[in-house]
Amino acid sequence: MHNIHRRNFLKAAGAATAGLVTANIALSAYASSVAPKPQAGKSVIGLIAPKMDVVRVGFIGVGERGFSHVEQFCHLEGVELKAICDTHQAVLDRAVDHIVKQNRPKPAVYTGNDLSYRDLLSRDDIDIVIISTPWEWHAPMAIETMESGKHAFVEVPMALTVEECWQVVDTAERTQKNCMMMENVNYGREELMVLNMVRQGVFGELLHGEAAYIHELRWQMKEIDHKTGSWRTYWHTKRNGNLYPTHGLGPVSQYMNINRGDRFDYLTSMSSPALGRALYAKREFPADHERNQLKYINGDINTSLIKTVKGRTIMVQHDTTTPRPYSRHNLIQGTNGVFAGFPNRIAVENGGFGQSYHEWDMDMQKWYDKYDHPLWQRIGKEAEINGGHGGMDFVMLWRMIYCLRNGETLDQDVYDGASWSVVNILSEHSLNDRSNSVTFPDFTRGAWQTAKPLGIIGA
């Protein structure tokens, strides 16, 4: 310190103090957003919407992900595709052409500007809206959808801030409309089989889970003017944390009955250095290209640890940058054994097929024969034909429509969407506070303690 000139030292000290003040203000704002607010309506746990003979559907966003939903909906019975909205004419034309080729009526089309979706929402012949837009639009569009008297089905993540999560929850409770974040991985064959096994006690009392989104997506940086990379790349310059937690976390949460007898209590998070995106840009783009002018701050690998109120632990990882095979981990450990994914393998002490729990059993067929989930037994072949991430997309949409047409509760509610999505911002808060733990908001306002556990869905 003696080498620092007094004036520079005072400047440095002032800057440090200002930084601490800013950090304290941010943490104070976060702390105030954690506390439950006065309830504007009533809980939507177990919400059942009036039965619909035919579900009338509107789509906001029919580009990459949205078009895949349009394709899947064309295979479903009991639905009418009433209207679509997007800001890009080419993807609108593609969606309309596909719908007409499937011998369905031509939908109404809305475009022109970023707010054209409001014209779609003003219609009185739409029951549900499928939202597949860039992340920052998810919460506002879901809120406006419910305000317009429609059920919202939104892509992941549901929201990007704690306050947005509360706003979506509050709107669902006030309007008594469904807001389901469409976590498709919960409907994968392996994930549903494991849910079935957990509910039948195969792994004993649950202790620990591991979830991840490990998916090398640097190539999306080459999508400059349109498609996912044209907007998703910039999130690596805005935040440092787990940008995309729900694909791995959703299934593990349902195994553990999160928000239905247990809930997330607190989280701590760490990130590696942010190196890979800049290196990729340097290698793949000219030196003066915009991708080389960006400052990438999101750590290449983020690892967060969650503690539940019942004392269980969950590791959640995010890595869309390093060169490695795809994985969601999908590990669930109990007092009697463990399942782990990528590749699928099982070890149990009692109730298995004679193998030692000291070695992995990687022969899944006998486990499928015994524990394959009722949903996959019912529509698995149809799902495999129609596709969508191995069939999970079709199963999810089929199940959504089934529940709406038969007056059943959806498998995922607004509290799930908020709890799984908020890991994004909580991981950032923890990182900004030297990886100290941060508290999860209780979006159920205590109702998790009496909520009915999630059973073997669709059984």
Swiss-Prot record:
Listed name of the protein: Glycosyl hydrolase family 109 protein
Keywords: Glycosidase, Hydrolase, NAD, Signal
Positions with a binding annotation for NAD(+): 64-65, 86, 135-138, 155-156, 184, 244
Coiled-coil positions: none
Keyword NAD among record annotations: yes
Organism: Shewanella baltica (strain OS185)
Gene3D superfamilies xref list: Dihydrodipicolinate Reductase, domain 2, NAD(P)-binding Rossmann-like Domain
Cofactors: NAD(+)
PANTHER family, per the entry: BCDNA.GH03377 (PTHR43818), GLYCOSYL HYDROLASE FAMILY 109 PROTEIN (PTHR43818:SF1)
Family assignment from sequence similarity: Belongs to the Gfo/Idh/MocA family. Glycosyl hydrolase 109 subfamily.
Biological role stated in the UniProt entry: Glycosidase.
EC number of the protein: 3.2.1.-
Secretion signal, residue range per the UniProt entry: 1-31
NCBIfam families linked: TAT_signal_seq
Modification comment: Predicted to be exported by the Tat system. The position of the signal peptide cleavage has not been experimentally proven.
UniProt-recorded Gene Ontology molecular function terms: hydrolase activity, acting on glycosyl bonds; nucleotide binding
Pfam families named in the record: GFO_IDH_MocA, Glyco_hydro_109_C, TAT_signal
Broad EC category: hydrolase
Cofactor remark from the record: Binds 1 NAD(+) per subunit. The NAD(+) cannot dissociate.
Annotated S-S bridges: none
Residues noted as binding substrate in the record, renumbered to the chain: 213, 232, 244-247, 326
